[in-house]
């Protein structure tokens, strides 16, 4: 039964973490030629330490509404204290009447200047997962 459901892959949708002055912000970037409709994003941070203990943040949910083609939407501010955690963003949206979702994970200690790239559409530098 599940094999009968088409498994479309998410393409041309990115999550970017950008430093803006003293602040850091997380953005959803729509590189597609079509809008993303009813966008929902779930975000959380987590890590399991060598001794087995876990550190977790609260899970936050964001309703971004529609994101036009070739544009972006701010998801949330992020603080440097959580860069030592894996930061997960689970994006769900409709595109061409199809429900799509993708999980983006910034691994611990990867949000740093040496990993910066130019973020398309946003025209700023930051860390991006496509």
Predicted feature residues:
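Exposed beta-strand and adjacent loop surfaces of beta-rich binding modules
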Residues: 23, 36-38, 88
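Residues that act as N-cap/strand-start positions at coil-to-secondary-structure junctions
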Residues: 9, 23, 58-61
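Short edge beta-strand/loop segments characteristic of extracellular beta-sandwich folds
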Residues: 25-32, 78
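Terminal connector regions
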Residues: 76-130
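Intrinsically disordered, low-complexity Pro/Gly/Ser/Thr-rich segments with frequent PxxP/GP/PP motifs
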Residues: 49-86, 96-97
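Low-complexity, acidic Ser/Thr/Pro/Gly-rich terminal tails and inter-domain linkers that flank the onset
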Residues: 1-21, 31, 103, 109-110, ...
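Short acidic, flexible loop segments centered on an aromatic residue
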Residues: 33-50
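Surface loops and adjacent helix of pleckstrin homology
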Residues: 29, 41, 105
């Amino acid at each position: 039964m599940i094999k009968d459901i088409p498994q479309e892959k998410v393409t041309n949708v990115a999550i970017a973490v950008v430093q803006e002055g003293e602040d850091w912000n997380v953005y959803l970037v729509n590189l597609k030629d079509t809008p993303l409709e009813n966008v929902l994003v779930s975000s959380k941070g987590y890590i399991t330490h060598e001794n087995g203990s876990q550190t977790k943040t609260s899970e936050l949910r964001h309703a971004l509404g529609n994101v036009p083609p070739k544009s972006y939407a701010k998801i949330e501010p992020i603080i440097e204290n959580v860069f030592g955690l894996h930061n997960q963003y689970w994006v769900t949206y409709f595109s061409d009447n199809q429900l799509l979702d993708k999980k983006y994970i910034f691994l611990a200690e990867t949000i740093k200047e040496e990993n910066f790239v130019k973020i398309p559409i946003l025209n700023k530098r930051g860390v991006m997962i496509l």
